[in-house]
Amino acid sequence: MTDPRETVPPGNSGEETIGEAFAWLNRTVEAINREAVNHLPRELIFQVWQRSWRYWHDEQGMSESYTKYRYLCIIQKAVYMHVRKGCTCLGRGHGPGGWRPGPPPPPPPGLV
């Protein structure tokens, strides 16, 4: 009889190093930003990044990685809600300035 309990997938055995976890976080934040610009105004993404950094890092004194994690949670939820409401973007995005015309705002620091 086989064991009915879930098994840990290969590579997720708890043997990761802290460096690998931080690398995963950085890759994931960059990936969600690349996808988010196809669905959300760049201005919104930039403002969420700036406000997350200001609140979690500067005011609350949290680490850089925790700040990125909180930002990731917010942007992931925003993209999810956008798609759930019936995304009609078709992956084309909204242009360099988001929904409004004009040049794009600067990207979040470290996410060029």
Swiss-Prot record:
Subunit field text: Interacts with the P6 region of unprocessed GAG. Interacts with host VPRBP/DCAF1, leading to change substrate specificity of the CUL4A-DDB1 E3 ligase complex. Interacts with host NUP153.
Biased composition (Pro residues): 101-112
Region (Disordered): 93-112
GO cellular component, one term: host cell nucleus
Protein name: Protein Vpx
Keyword annotations from UniProtKB, A to Z: AIDS, Host nucleus, Host-virus interaction, Inhibition of host innate immune response by virus, Viral immunoevasion, Virion
Function: Plays a role in nuclear translocation of the viral pre-integration complex (PIC), thus is required for the virus to infect non-dividing cells. Targets specific host proteins for degradation by the 26S proteasome. Acts by associating with the cellular CUL4A-DDB1 E3 ligase complex through direct interaction with host VPRPB/DCAF-1. This change in the E3 ligase substrate specificity results in the degradation of host SAMHD1. In turn, SAMHD1 depletion allows viral replication in host myeloid cells by preventing SAMHD1-mediated hydrolysis of intracellular dNTPs necessary for reverse transcription.
Annotated stretches, region: Binds to human NUP153: 61-80
Outcome reported for the amino acid change (mutating Y66A): No effect on non-dividing cells infection
Lineage: Viruses, Riboviria, Pararnavirae, Artverviricota, Revtraviricetes
Superkingdom in the source lineage: Viruses
Compartment(s) where it occurs, according to its Swiss-Prot or TrEMBL record: Virion; Host nucleus
GO BP annotations listed: symbiont-mediated suppression of host innate immune response; viral life cycle
Source organism of this protein record: Human immunodeficiency virus type 2 subtype A (isolate ROD)
Record-stated family: Belongs to the lentivirus VPX protein family.
Record Pfam families: VPR
Segments carrying motif Nuclear localization signal: 65-72
